[in-house]
Amino acid sequence: MFRSDKAEKMDKRRRRQSKAKASCSEEVSSIEWEAVKMSEEEEDLISRMYKLVGDRWELIAGRIPGRTPEEIERYWLMKHGVVFANRRRDFFRK
């Protein structure tokens, strides 16, 4: 009896994990990020704050009224990320 209860719990756990993995992979692969427009002042502040505190997006967003940590991170990744660097290069070649 104990063994079957344990096996049942493991099965439930595996199902939950596989659902979580599936939703994460779908989310990542299906997202098409739109460019985040930042003013020059915001860009400067983000760069300076990043040098001071690293990727603590909540802290950086707290210094820029009306911006969420997600927007700040998305902006940073799109401007400085390797994946987006290739897209920028291809875009400007056209």
UniProtKB/Swiss-Prot annotation:
Cellular component, GO annotation: nucleus
A GO biological-process term: positive regulation of trichoblast fate specification
Tissue: Expressed in trichomes and in young developing leaves, as well as in root hair and stele cells (pericycle and vascular tissues). Expressed in epidermal root hairless cells (atrichoblasts) and moves to root hair cells (trichoblasts) by a cell-to-cell movement through plasmodesmata (at protein level).
Molecular function terms, GO-annotated: DNA binding; DNA-binding transcription factor activity
Compartments (UniProt record): Nucleus
Complex and partners: Interacts with GL3 and BHLH2. Interacts with SIEL.
Function: Transcription factor. Determines the fate of epidermal cell differentiation. Represses trichome development by lateral inhibition. Together with GL3 or BHLH2, promotes the formation of hair developing cells (H position) in root epidermis, probably by inhibiting non-hair cell formation. Represses the expression of GL2 and WER in H cells. Positively regulates stomatal formation in the hypocotyl.
PANTHER family reported in the protein's UniProt record: TRANSCRIPTION FACTOR CPC (PTHR47998:SF12), TRANSCRIPTION FACTOR MYB51-LIKE ISOFORM X1 (PTHR47998)
Protein name: Transcription factor CPC
Organism: Arabidopsis thaliana
Encoding gene (name): CPC
